[in-house]
């Protein structure tokens, strides 16, 4: 190729736009034979005002440069110089001349590409002295696109126009924005999606475990209440019945907030409704935690046991206190799938054991002591009758009796329990002093005067009658001692 370090190549700048290759060859051919004339054109094939002429003899090129430089051609003074290879193509990197910065690189690149490639790499020997157009930069930029960032970088560092200066600052701003967004996004991650997942997984694990920690609090530890829309009518019924004598938090916790697992309870809402009408008329504020919604560890297995629980509730829970029903087939079983064969014995036992317990006794037993007797309840009720879980709970509250038998000794235990919880009951503004007349209960007043019911203790068969018969046979509901005011209520089958 001729352009590879060819000393006979001249650069002619400042040409008239009307000058073409033939005119250039005719003018410069006087100094010697010309091998190539290259007129740089734009996309529209119009002259850009400069050209390259290659002489066969380098001496002729030198003579032509000396002779033609500064002369007028077609009405314009031209510049003729020795063309040089760009410094970046010969291994080094040089900044383009000052006048070259005002030229558009894209046009020169495309026009050079459209022309012959033989003279593409040549530049004039004297850089920075082109008066009318600065063609050298166009050639430089046409030879290599890679120099465009290099050309732009120094101009921004040396105080170029504001738009060029703003580019690095924009990048810096974007980097700073990204940096600032990083911690914010991390903080969002800490408070957003994962906690929810963690919450879901944690409450699911809670639901299937044997721990009843969540039951001890009143602040809604049960995050899954969104599936309870099918159970709103039963809970509405509870609120109607139970809020008559309950404190402020009873209604808010009922059926909406305090469910451990409510998505499987739609089959059990009617049994719990029956319980609510009979049992919780005088219950206290947290009583509704046990209403068929919250107090089931796993209610998907209690399908067969809800009706026995209903009948049992009319007999046994009719006059129990506020957390008494937590142990009745719903709440006190960490896994109710074990209660399949033991529901009637458990019914009898819960009836006898919780008959005279008060608010704190039930809350401790219903919440924290489920681990002890809940599983024993599912495994063996004879062992449960003589187990120590109830004994520990009762002794902790001032009772000195052991596990309750089915008959006589239970009465003294109940009496002492009534006496032990008089202060706790007074905190809530009312006491629960009398109990069911189903046969095995006795009722105590605040002075812990306990007397046994006149009837003989019924057998297991009599303790567990038909649900409607049981509902009608309970006569004593409660004798509430509240600042000297007492009221009693008769339970009949019309509440069923």
From Swiss-Prot:
Q: Which GO terms describe its biological process?
A: mRNA processing; positive regulation of mRNA splicing, via spliceosome; regulation of alternative mRNA splicing, via spliceosome; RNA splicing
**Compositionally biased region (Basic and acidic residues):** 204-214, 242-253, 276-289, 313-326, 335-349, 484-496
Main location as per UniProt: nucleus
Q: Compositionally biased, Low complexity: which spans? A: 97-114, 149-159
Provide the tissue specificity.
Testis-specific.
Matches recorded under InterPro entries = Nucleotide-bd_a/b_plait_sf (IPR012677), RBD_domain_sf (IPR035979), RBM (IPR050441), RBM1CTR (IPR012604), RRM_dom (IPR000504)
| Entry GO CC | nucleolus; nucleoplasm; spliceosomal complex
What molecular function terms (GO) are annotated for this protein? mRNA binding; RNA binding
- Residues in RRM domain copies: 8-85
Q: Report the locations given in the UniProt record.
A: Nucleus
Domain of life from the UniProt record: Eukaryota
Q: Where is the stretch described as Disordered?
A: 78-349, 452-496
What keywords sit in the KW lines? Activator, mRNA processing, mRNA splicing, Nucleus, RNA-binding
Q: Where is the composition biased (Polar residues)?
A: 175-184
Miscellaneous comment in the UniProt entry for this protein:
The RBMY1 proteins are encoded by repeated regions of the Y chromosome, mostly within the AZFb region. The exact number of functional copies is unclear and may vary between individuals, and some of them may represent pseudogenes. The proteins are very similar, which makes the characterization of each protein difficult. Thus, most experiments do not discriminate between the different members. One can therefore suppose that reported interactions with a RBMY1 protein involve all the proteins.
Q: Tell me, how does this one assemble?
A: Interacts with splicing factor proteins SFRS3/SRP20, TRA2B/SFRS10, KHDRBS1/SAM68 and KHDRBS3.
Q: Which function does this protein serve?
A: RNA-binding protein involved in pre-mRNA splicing. Required for sperm development. Acts additively with TRA2B to promote exon 7 inclusion of the survival motor neuron SMN. Binds non-specifically to mRNAs.
Q: What is this protein called?
A: RNA-binding motif protein, Y chromosome, family 1 member A1
Highest lineage ranks of the organism? Answer: Eukaryota, Metazoa, Chordata, Craniata, Vertebrata
